A protein has these predicted regions:
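Conserved catalytic/acceptor-binding region of the Class I
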Residues: 125-126, 132, 136-205, 225
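A short SAM/SAH-binding and catalytic strip from SAM-dependent methyltransferases
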Residues: 110-124
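Class I SAM-dependent methyltransferase SAM/SAH-binding core
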Residues: 46-102, 126
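A short acidic, Gly/Pro-enriched loop at the edge of an enzyme's catalytic core
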Residues: 100-111
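Conserved donor sugar-nucleotide recognition element shared by glycan-biosynthetic enzymes
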Residues: 5, 24, 28-32, 74-77, ...
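Conserved Class I S-adenosyl-L-methionine
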Residues: 28, 54, 174-269
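Conserved class I S-adenosyl-L-methionine
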Residues: 2-45, 56, 80
Length: 269
């Protein structure tokens, strides 16, 4: 099992290293700031951002004065997060790491947060245990997870119809199902609030160009196209263009699409 797991994790790392995720993360900067605002962090709060990407969550938390540590599987993301924090003159620490084997002590953080990040780790039960382990008793685990029925969940489903996901890996969007999240944390949390929230993807170009944008910059989409021959790529492109067009709320040549996610805030018992 371990060699298979190592191979899967290597593929996942290659996927998230492909493209330039920061170009995608820009699209929900405002949503990330709103997510942080709802956490009502205080100066000095010790926060860990798991799978931090380029710092969408970590940086607004650092602006508030939280004591922020971010970690990500992809070294390029860690570097970008550091650079983004330095650009604003913020103090935050960023590490390369694995959500399933966090390199931090037990009970180290007041808040353990993850926005569209830890949900992609291949073993959700292991991930849940690690999020809890590094959180102080009475501290909070905060997650933003795409739902199966929301737009991004539908985009994943569309892509999977052309390029099946790795065998044996539970769908990441199951983290967007409240009952599943409650089952994964179980009695190890004393409370759990789950709320449907919406993020708007806004781009100053057409849905057709949005698909090309994702193909260029979003690792999972780039890898999906790379796994297909010319005809397969054309079919995937058409389906994704149709999906973005059907959900587009703009008629002026630009794109605005709403995507639901599940916001989870749990208190460690």
């Amino acid at each position: 099992m371990q060699p298979e797991l190592d191979t899967l994790k290597s593929k996942l790392k290659a996927t998230w290293t492909a493209g330039d995720f920061s170009q995608i993360a820009k699209a929900y900067t405002i949503g990330a700031e709103q997510f942080v605002e709802r956490l009502t962090l205080q100066p000095g709060t010790k926060l860990l951002d798991v799978a931090c990407g380029s710092g969408n969550l970590a940086i607004p938390a650092a602006r508030i004065g939280a004591d922020v540590t971010g970690m990500d599987l992809a070294p390029e993301m860690v570097l970008q997060a550091r650079q983004n924090a330095e650009r604003e003159g913020l103090t935050a620490h960023f590490d390369e790491g694995d959500a399933e084997a966090l390199q931090y002590d037990d009970n180290a953080f007041d808040v353990v947060a993850t926005m569209f990040g830890a949900m992609f780790a291949p073993r959700p039960d292991v991930t849940a245990s690690e999020l809890l382990r590094v959180c102080k008793p009475g501290g909070r685990i905060a997650m933003a997870n795409w739902t199966p029925t929301g737009f991004i969940g539908q985009m994943f489903k569309t892509t999977a119809g052309h390029v099946p996901p790795p065998a044996g890996m539970p769908s990441p969007v199951l983290w967007g199902v409240e009952a599943t999240v409650r089952e994964r944390f179980g009695s190890r949390v004393s409370s759990l609030d789950a709320t449907a929230q919406t993020i708007f993807f806004r781009f100053p170009f057409s849905p057709v160009d949005v698909v090309e944008h994702f193909r260029t910059f979003y690792g999972p989409t780039q890898k999906a196209f790379g796994a297909l021959d010319e005809n397969g790529q054309a079919a995937l492109r058409k389906d994704l263009e149709n999906l973005w067009s059907e959900h587009n709320q703009k008629t002026d040549g630009t794109t605005e699409v709403a995507s639901e996610y599940l916001e989870v805030v749990a208190t460690k018992a």
